[in-house]
UniProtKB/Swiss-Prot annotation:
Its EC number is 1.3.1.14. The gene is pyrD. This is Dihydroorotate dehydrogenase B (NAD(+)), catalytic subunit. Catalyzes the conversion of dihydroorotate to orotate with NAD(+) as electron acceptor. Keywords: Cytoplasm, Flavoprotein, FMN, NAD, Oxidoreductase, Pyrimidine biosynthesis. Pathway: Pyrimidine metabolism; UMP biosynthesis via de novo pathway; orotate from (S)-dihydroorotate (NAD(+) route): step 1/1. One of its GO terms (biological process) is 'de novo' UMP biosynthetic process. FMN binds at residues 19, 43-44, 97, 125, 163, 189, 215, 241-242, 263-264. It comes from Bacillus velezensis (strain DSM 23117 / BGSC 10A6 / LMG 26770 / FZB42). Belongs to the dihydroorotate dehydrogenase family. Type 1 subfamily.
Length: 311
């Protein structure tokens, strides 16, 4: 009922913790068996270790949070020698998030990390809003996005998914350029750029001034973008942005996503992913669906039937 097959990814269910909200899984392994997850999107990995942005770099908002972590990570060598081998104990495919400042940085990380035995796909991070070079610079220009995608595809041993930024005028144009460059799938959306001010000082709360807005506040934006992009491309989408419940996950599937990543909600409730997995079959049946594949893109597909007419 819950199985989903995507390029490189045979998922037992469509629920995946999102990169940047799950580390490398060690904190959450103390709460539940990570083998129950459809997959795991690990923390963004760069060639060299990064300390990230100065603090403060997290701020709560009324319906989510702002972060300006700045791709803090232990670097490629550490991830290959320690984090990925530790994750081999779990029966779930790993999606490695690859980041960098230049095309060669991405290629270096992609070539090596894609050869790890438990890495089944790459997530190309071209949409981080909190770094000064690389990151979102690639994700806001269709030509640059396509060139980077093509370069990484040439060296990767596994399928490549590209993470899209919502901070663009036309996300569909970016998506189509990335598809044409050979991407195997898309993940979307990354965070929206936002800011909070300290009323006492009149200054931005975050040391970076701006940060990425995530959580329930961005879900309507994410749903709209998945809905639009899924009709314009022929590669699968892993949807994300404000997912907290099985009902939220179903909404993304109906919009056109083939799987769903859960991000900020992990900070609020460490059990959120297994809870959604447990509740999803009931929610699917409640709305007349017998499988995940049956409801993907249902909101826009022309051959629509009322739920009570389906077998």
């Amino acid at each position: 009922m819950l199985e989903v097959n995507l390029p490189g990814l045979q998922l037992k269910n469509p629920i995946i913790p999102a990169s940047g909200c799950f580390g490398f899984g060690k904190e959450y392994a103390g709460f539940y068996d990570l083998s129950c997850l459809g997959g795991i999107m690990i923390k963004a990995t760069t060639n060299e270790a990064r300390f990230g942005n100065p603090t403060p770099r997290v701020a709560e908002t009324s319906a989510g949070m702002l972060n300006a972590i700045g791709l803090q990570n232990p670097g490629l060598e550490h991830v290959l020698n320690h984090e990925l081998p530790w994750l081999e104990q779990f029966d779930t495919p790993i999606i490695a998030n690859v980041a960098g400042s230049q095309v060669d940085d991405y290629k270096e990380v992609a070539e090596h990390i894609s050869q790890a035995p438990n890495v089944h796909a790459l997530e190309l991070n071209i949409s981080c809003p909190n770094v000064k070079t690389g990151g979102i610079a690639f994700g806001t220009d269709p030509v640059m996005a396509a060139e980077l995608t093509k370069a990484v595809k040439e060296v990767s041993a596994v399928p490549v998914y590209v993470k899209l930024s919502p901070n663009v005028a036309n996300i569909t144009e970016i998506a189509k350029a990335i598809e044409a460059a050979g991407a195997d799938g898309l993940t979307m959306i990354n965070t929206l750029i936002g800011m909070r001010l300290d009323l006492k000082t009149g200054r931005p709360i975050l040391a970076n001034k701006t940060g990425g807005l995530s959580g329930p506040a961005i879900k309507p934006v994410a749903i709209r973008m998945v809905y639009e992009v899924s009709q314009a491309v022929h590669i699968p989408i892993i949807g994300m942005g404000g997912v907290q419940t099985a009902e939220d996950a179903l909404e993304f599937l109906l919009a056109g996503a083939s799987a769903v990543a859960v991000g900020t909600a992990n900070f609020v409730n460490p059990f959120v992913c297994p809870e959604i997995i447990e509740q999803l079959p009931r929610v699917l049946r409640q709305y007349g669906f017998q499988s995940v594949s049956e409801c993907i893109g249902r909101s826009w597909k022309h051959e629509k039937q009322p739920a009570h007419h389906r077998a």
